[in-house]
Amino acid sequence: EFLFARTMIGVFKNIEYMCNRTSSKTWGKEAWKKIVVCIVSDRRAKINPRTRAVLAGLGVYQDGIAKQQVNGKDVTAHIYEYTTQVGLELKGTQVSLKPRSATPVQLLFCLKEKNQKKINSHRWFFQAFGRVLDPNICVLIDAGTKPGKDSIYQLWKAFDLEPMCGGACGEIKVMLDHGKKLYNPLIAT
């Protein structure tokens, strides 16, 4: 849940950043309405119970409703949707909920019944949600990766400035505790 929360905190800050771009023709106060955060998780029985609790705290998951079968047919995935105004806070590795500022966040959570690996999760995202949401751009972020406060905006800007751009990537920096240094050159690169 710590890694998931770290990623979500970064995503929330990016949405706030875009909402604060009041002189932008695209973004601004209502920017949150143009952004949907899709979370895809493999295998219902495998998801960390504390991560489930964080998702429930955000309002995008309800424990106890998901079933393996409906009318004798196997269920492939469970989809939850919610627009939250709850935020997350990290104190060490402890995750806690906190009231957010005025910026809501639209969440879509897909909990797959079976473990079908990362590529299948990407397929779910593009084929299922992509068709419905019809996004201009998609940003894929693994749990544990914390985007900088304007990283998602910078990726969007690359696509906006160059409409023929098919893909872009950001820089990933190692997160170290204060006062720590990397002495292993293989890890430092």
UniProtKB/Swiss-Prot annotation:
Molecular function per GO: chitin synthase activity
Enzyme Commission no: 2.4.1.16
Cellular localisation: Cell membrane
Listed GO CC annotations: cell septum; plasma membrane
Membrane topology: Multi-pass membrane protein
Keywords recorded for this protein, A-Z: Cell membrane, Cell wall biogenesis/degradation, Glycosyltransferase, Membrane, Transferase, Transmembrane
InterPro entries the UniProt entry points to: Chitin_synth, Chitin_synth_fun
Keyword Cell membrane: yes
Catalytic activity: [(1->4)-N-acetyl-beta-D-glucosaminyl](n) + UDP-N-acetyl-alpha-D-glucosamine = [(1->4)-N-acetyl-beta-D-glucosaminyl](n+1) + UDP + H(+)
Highest taxon, organism lineage: Eukaryota
Record-level GO BP terms: cell wall organization; chitin biosynthetic process
Family per record: Belongs to the chitin synthase family. Class I subfamily.
Cited function: Polymerizes chitin, a structural polymer of the cell wall and septum, by transferring the sugar moiety of UDP-GlcNAc to the non-reducing end of the growing chitin polymer.
Name of the protein in its database record: Chitin synthase 1
